[in-house]
Curated annotation (Swiss-Prot):
Disulfide bonds: none annotated. It comes from Mycoplasmopsis pulmonis (strain UAB CTIP). Residues 19-26 are annotated as: G1. It catalyses: GTP + H2O = GDP + phosphate + H(+). Residues 60-64 are annotated as: G2. One of its GO terms (cellular component) is cytosol. The keyword Cytoplasm applies. Pfam families: GTP_EFTU, GTP_EFTU_D2, GTP_EFTU_D3. This is Elongation factor Tu.
Length: 396
């Protein structure tokens, strides 16, 4: 099949399937692609091609993720599906595949299970704003409407418990397998599901519209002109002669003006999200800015040293530690471009973290750096990644 041209006229949204093992996430992903392919909006995919998810690396961690894309009449979607539970946890915590919304898949025959709860909690912690529910396998409960209603109530109360709007969340009933097999009644449910995703999950704020932030990777001096900081623009855009703050490692950010912007040795009028750019900073000494700091729109981000985080400790087979760690553990926390040493405090009643655990804890860094809720980091020992984390709440 010829490659579809990327159509920028449609809004782009990133979504993913989440839910308990064997509740039908991958079958649903295949069903969505297959049903939409009949309208020429996607390439049909079978279960096996999605299930054979390729490995990718994010923050030094290997994750298996399948990425597929499709369109509805309204939008263009990038959809991520992970084969294993640990892949979900790693994916969410590293932010490898950003999710603007989730499709929570729950089997009507089982109802919510432990990983259903875990994925809802994790989605809340890493900032997935909304989800739509697909109640799968209802074909196995024909005539048992009361049972289906009970499961639906259970899902709504679970969503509310974790801070989602359980009452307003759309719940679509269907059978992913029957839709994949071409049953017209169940294909219609997939169309209903995508209508709900189109209408209930909001279009995210474009990276360009967010406040400017560049993570400093390198600093050098140009004789007679001043100090240049280079790095990747994470978000927003910046015009020449704009003010920025140098944030991180000091209690108070330092303000400066950008007098020149360079990319690939060419002068630019502006830098925007995704660019690798060099910014010439007025009146800044080479020692005033270093790798690991950020240049940001004044007032948009402040340095912090203490926060709550959701973390995943890698298993031994994943290159992680061979032994648990305890509450006096002091690894390096790698944010954007640099390592900062810090300590961890466990929640009450927890004595240790085993390789493979997913846990919430408090981190206190030895020097403040630019972080906000949702900032991702790696946990490292001597340059080796042993875990990943996401900031869930700022404390200091």
């Amino acid at each position: 099949m010829a490659k579809l041209d990327f159509d920028r006229s449609k809004e782009h949204v990133n979504i993913g399937t989440i839910g308990h093992v064997d509740h039908g996430k991958t079958t649903l992903t295949a069903a969505i692609a297959t049903v939409l392919s009949k309208k020429g909006l996607a390439e049909a995919k079978d279960y096996a091609s999605i299930d054979a998810a390729p490995e990718e690396k994010a923050r030094g961690i290997t994750i298996n993720t399948a990425h597929i894309e499709y369109e509805t009449e309204k939008r263009h979607y990038a959809h991520v599906d992970c084969p294993g539970h640990a892949d979900y946890v790693k994916n969410m915590i590293t932010g490898a595949a950003q999710m603007d919304g989730g499709i929570l898949v729950v089997s009507a025959t089982d109802g919510p299970m432990p990983q259903t709860r875990e994925h809802i909690l994790l989605s809340k912690q890493v900032g997935v704003p909304k989800m739509v529910v697909f109640l799968n396998k209802v074909d196995m409960l024909e005539g048992e409407d009361e049972m289906i209603e009970l499961v639906e109530l259970e899902i709504r109360s679970l969503l509310s418990e974790y801070g989602f709007d359980g009452d307003k969340t759309p719940i679509i009933k269907g059978s992913a397998l029957k839709a994949l097999e071409g049953n017209p009644q169940y294909e219609k449910n997939i169309e209903e599901l995508m209508d709900a995703v189109d209408n209930y999950i909001e279009t995210p704020v474009k990276e360009l519209d967010k406040p400017f932030l560049l993570a400093v990777e390198d600093v050098f001096t140009i004789t007679g002109r001043g100090t240049v900081a280079t790095g990747k623009v994470e978000r927003g855009q910046l015009n020449i002669n704009s003010e920025v703050e140098i944030v991180g490692f000091t209690e108070k950010p330092k303000k400066t003006t950008v007098t020149g912007i360079e990319m690939f040795r060419k002068n630019l009028k502006e830098a925007q999200a995704g660019d690798n750019a060099g910014l010439l900073l007025r009146g800044v000494d080479r020692n005033d800015v270093e790798r690991g700091q950020v240049l940001a729109k004044p007032g948009s981000i402040v340095p912090h040293s203490k926060f709550e985080a959701a973390i995943y400790a890698l298993k031994k087979e994943e290159g992680g530690r061979h032994t648990p760690f305890f509450s006096n553990y002091k690894p390096q926390f790698y944010f954007r471009t640099t390592d900062v040493t810090g300590g961890v405090v466990f929640p009450a009643g927890r004595e240790m973290v085993m390789p493979g655990d997913n846990v919430d804890l408090v981190v206190e860094l030895i020097s403040p750096i630019a972080v906000e809720e949702g900032t991702k980091f790696s946990i490292r020992e001597g340059g080796r990644t042993v875990g990943a984390g996401s900031v869930t709440k700022i404390l200091k």
